[in-house]
Amino acid sequence: MSYEEVQTLLQMINVDLSEQYARSLFQKCDRSADSRLDHEEIEIFCRELLRRPELDTVFLRYSANDCVLSTVDLRDFLKDQGEDASLLHAQSLILTYELNEWAQKNQFMTPNGFTMYMLSKENCVLNPEHARVYQDMTHPLAHYFISSSHNTYLTKDQLTGDSSIEPYIRALNHGCRCVELDCWDGDKGEPVIYHGHTLTSKIPFVNVIEVIKEYAFKASPYPLILSLENHCSVEQQTVMAQQLRSILGDKLLTKPLGGLDPHSLPSPEDLKGKILVKGKKEHGAVEGSSSTSELSSSDEEASRTSKKGDQKPSVSKLSPELSELVVYTCSVSFKSFEHAARNPATELSSFSESDATRHIKDSGMYFVRHNSHQLSRIYPSGQRLQSSNYNPQEMWNAGCQIVALNFQTPGEQMDLNQGRFLQNGQCGYTLKPPFMCQPGTTFNPENVGGGPGHRPVLFTVRIISAQQLPKPEWDKPSSIVDPQVWVEIHGAPIDNNKKKTPHIDNNGFNPQWDCTFNFTVHAPDLALVRFMVEDHDYTSSNDFLGQYTLPFTSLRTGYRHVRLLKVDGSTLSPASLFVHITVGPCESSPSKSSTKSPARSPTKSSAKGP
């Protein structure tokens, strides 16, 4: 490769080196002095380019002889990381990541082996214990946040977009545990699914149920809820019931579980492998129920997004065959928290985002209490015709379980949803904090200055560097990104906060910041942390490059790599951030974060920070 060809290569991988440094590095690696790099020289050039001086600095802080890490040196590092600091674990890491035979034989780790280890999944910022199902799955359903999709069949907007089975497959493969089916009378007696009174296309109900049968439990063994928005005639409701029974077979829950109170909610563990129907139930079908066959909140949702002047009377009669498939998730109109408290836990109310927000502002504590007993479903405003999303965190703060989002619309709100359900094996159920599950809780999401859920901690995050950031897809091939990093806290209102690093000019390959932020997190059990990288632009809005969101309680302290994700939530490998994290007791409770340097020491012990 000539020098000009090397420059083209650097541009392709988003590296903008100064002319002086690029030529100096080229000449250093051109050992044959023929103004070209052969295969071996290209390898040396890339190795020099890929050097991680910030990792070398960490390595040297722990190396007793500045050459290698002994098992004792590595043990000290692991201790400061808050990990298993046994010599046996240190030895196993050397055997796994050290490629130099002499070093491995003598139980040493070289800088290259250390880099391999630091870049491995073993050093991810997400607690590996939380990557599996680790929570108690035997609580009632109301004690869990449940990953939920709104108008699952839509591929785009709410008025003209196509309906398809593909969004069901994607949602189920991502661990979604509540999908929505808007059911209407179709031709030849076959019910269809589409967004009623709009120009969205129609798909047969039977096709969706067949897809659900195939994909329901591929990503999670825990119960799947079918949220039926029923606008069908009694005759086609009966067809729906027959198709549900014949296709889903014994996966479909058709009666209360034996040995359990039929008026209490079972647990995800009790309902493993079962599909539940959420819908209205015939009046009096469940003793003590306040359910009626009148228009429910869910039906109101459909009317709010329908084309004006194209309304039809809502269905007021229910098919007994379909009604009897509704067991633990009976849709009812919400009257008041006091009224709901007297009714069975198997009743479920749907709230528009605006109604839910009003209840949170006016009666936050009572909404949390309600959600310790019954399920609540939240759906987007009918004004969101382009399928935009509301902030799900506000609803989780009140303990709402079924917070339905438009999965087809990527963005910050879906990042938060993916982050919320990243833990617990991505099974679609995460256990709510204990203070949200007590019937008499005094937790109020609008005020966590004290009382339940208030256990402030100091979160210190040091953004050290990034690696191999992509260019925005629409950028010119010759452009180089100017990255900056946001660190965001999403949680109780008192905790919502974000800070950004300065931008680095013309370096998406290995930008260095070494910038430290302090945050006080008052309700850590509710908080999410979002790392977001964007391309700074002086003349227009900044372009999104990548992000990663996870529960605050799933963070690992120490030096970690944050593996960035694309806007659609898929992997952006090898793009990552290199960070240092500490979480410690909070001596004071400032409501805003501060920025300073250098970083605090890790909480587990005193670290040798660079």
Predicted regions and their residues:
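Long, acidic (Asp/Glu-rich), low-complexity accessory segments flanking structured domains
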Residues: M1-Y21, A33-C178, W184-Q401, L405-E473
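Hydrophobic beta-strand segments
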Residues: V6, L74, V461, P483-V487, ...
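C2-type phospholipid-binding modules
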Residues: V234, Q242-I247, M414, H522-L528, ...
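Short coil-to-beta strand junction motifs in C2/discoidin
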Residues: K471-Q484
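Short Trp-Ser/Thr-centered turn/loop motifs at beta-strand boundaries
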Residues: D495-N507
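Short proline/glycine- and polar residue-rich coil/turn motifs
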Residues: I504-P511, F552-L555
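Exposed aromatic-hydrophobic patches
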Residues: P511-H522, L550
